């Protein structure tokens, strides 16, 4: 494959074509038109921090590199967004927020703003757990809520309070 393509150094824009790695190692196959035309890459290994495992969805924009420039040895090194509309709304425009969100809508938000920051877990059905400097809040997404602030436990927005 590389004999007729030459060496390819640097990052190339690609699009995920297949993310179902039969070896379950986090590999993807991508379309990289500037290198392969309409063909997909071979299985591209992930380049990610130790302990981190996330696979981009089919159709997602990914950066592709090649080990020692060899097109037979693709590596996917991260994702790119075509526009701000593709970004998760929980992130914009605050750089002090880190959001991990699945395509199914489950998320973990880490917010480092002093005084208002914290950790919030959401699932796709609307249940929430929020841990902040002010306290802990639990919600079932259907109206029931528990808030723990200082020595007070509040149920359903103050319908019952225990101190």
Task: Go through each PLM region and give its residues.
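Hydrophobic packing positions characteristic
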Residues: 1-147
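Long terminal segments
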Residues: 145, 149-163
């Amino acid at each position: 494959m590389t004999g007729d393509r030459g060496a390819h150094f640097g990052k190339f824009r690609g699009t995920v074509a297949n993310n179902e790695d039969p070896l379950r190692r986090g590999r993807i196959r991508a379309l990289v038109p500037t290198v392969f035309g309409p063909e997909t890459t071979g299985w591209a290994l992930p380049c990610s921090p130790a302990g981190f495992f996330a696979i981009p969805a089919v159709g997602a924009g990914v950066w592709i590199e090649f080990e020692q420039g060899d097109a037979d040895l693709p590596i996917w090194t991260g994702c790119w967004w075509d526009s701000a509309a593709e970004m998760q709304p929980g992130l914009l425009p605050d750089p002090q927020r880190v959001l991990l969100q699945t395509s199914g809508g489950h998320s973990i938000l880490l917010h480092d703003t002093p005084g208002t920051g914290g950790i919030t877990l959401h699932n796709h059905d609307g249940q929430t757990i929020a841990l902040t400097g002010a306290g802990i809040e639990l919600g079932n997404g259907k109206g029931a809520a528990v808030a723990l602030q200082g020595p007070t436990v509040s149920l359903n927005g103050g319908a019952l309070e225990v101190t």
